Regions:
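A conserved active-site cap/scaffold subdomain adjacent to cofactor or substrate pockets
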Residues: 159-166, 179
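An internal, acidic/charged active-site-proximal segment
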Residues: 28-151, 236-244, 284-286
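Short acidic, glycine/tyrosine-flanked loop/strand segments centered on an H-E-D-like triad
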Residues: 20-28
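Acidic, metal-ligating active-site segments
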Residues: 1-21, 114, 144-152
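Long, low-complexity C-terminal extensions of enzymes
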Residues: 237-286
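Short, conserved catalytic/metal-binding motifs centered on acidic residues
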Residues: 3, 65-73, 88, 164, ...
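Short amphipathic alpha-helical "interface-anchor" segments enriched in bulky aromatics
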Residues: 121, 173-204
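Basic, amphipathic alpha-helical segments enriched in Lys/Arg and hydrophobic/aromatic residues
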Residues: 202-257
Length: 286
């Protein structure tokens, strides 16, 4: 589970937490002493912990929009955000109920209502996409505040619409969906953490070791995000994490080569010893 914080054109991974199913926690506790047993923490509890940590760091009076996909869209989490005077924009599953009616039924109920055509810039180099949306206002089940739901289709004949909730009723559907697009960097972070930085390489390790590994990987991606921020130039795309990683590797290699040349010049009769000290494990051709 990840919490990403966008700041203007920049974005930083604020925190990551490992979610373990209740069954997995019971399994792990069989091999642990009573005083070291793990407590099960639900998705809501993990999200709440991260949001409360972030809240303490936010400037007073900040306008906050919390964005998440349908996996996290519980009434408890939505209500937590509303109690903090934050707004929520999130995806919803089709079986959620608005005014006691499933939201997927509203597509038929509103068939007399014309679609609103909106255009959203793509989050990648592809052309802008057009969507056809309808909105319906009411109360989501177990959420006391009035909200509105966006029914979004790729075309008027699309039979698999997507559903989104917005608690800020002053926003248009286009404004709400444009804000929701800012959630995309979370997916980029997730992919990069697992495939490049090795976040998923924690199998068969103790829970304590996993937490330490998460902290190390979190620091690594924050370094790359900070590097991207330093390299930012207005009216130019923000450097990708891959570009920042390559630049770091090149800088590290250059520093190593300079040190290698310097040491060999000082001690020309100890070439192999110097190579082994600076490049351990690499065989030297003779």
């Amino acid at each position: 589970m990840e919490l990403h914080l966008p700041i203007g054109p920049f974005g930083f991974l604020f925190d990551t937490r490992l979610y373990l199913r209740e069954k997995k926690v019971r399994h792990l506790n069989r091999a642990r002493t009573k005083e070291n047993r793990l407590a099960y923490r639900s998705k809501y509890n993990l999200a709440r912990e991260m949001l409360l940590e972030l809240e303490a760091l936010l400037p007073a009076g900040s306008q906050v929009y919390v964005l998440f996909d349908s996996w996290y869209a519980s009434a408890k989490l939505i209500n937590l955000c509303l109690r903090k005077n934050w707004h929520v924009i999130c995806a919803l599953k089709s079986n959620r109920k608005l005014e006691k009616q499933r939201i997927d039924r509203y597509d038929q109920t509103l068939k007399h209502k014309p679609y609103q055509k909106i255009t959203l810039e793509a989050v990648d180099p592809r052309p802008a996409r057009t969507y056809y949306v309808r909105t319906v206002t009411g109360h989501l089940e177990k959420v006391p505040k009035e909200v509105y739901v966006i029914i979004s289709k790729k075309s008027t004949r699309d039979h698999s619409p997507k559903y989104f909730l917005c608690t800020d009723t002053s926003l248009s559907a286009q404004e709400a969906l444009k804000l929701y697009q800012k959630r995309w960097p979370v997916e980029v972070d997730n992919l990069y953490l697992k495939q490049v930085l090795g976040l998923g390489d924690f199998r068969l390790q103790s829970f304590e070791a996993i937490e330490k590994w998460f902290a190390v990987v979190n620091l690594a991606i924050n370094y790359l995000q900070y590097t991207a921020m330093l390299a930012y130039q207005p009216r130019r795309p923000l450097p990708s994490l891959a570009e920042c990683r390559r630049q770091h590797q090149h800088a590290h290699l250059q520093a190593l080569l300079r040190l290698l040349v310097s040491e060999i010049r000082k001690q020309p009769d100890r070439v192999e010893a110097i190579l082994q000290s600076l490049l351990p494990g690499i065989a030297v051709a003779t």
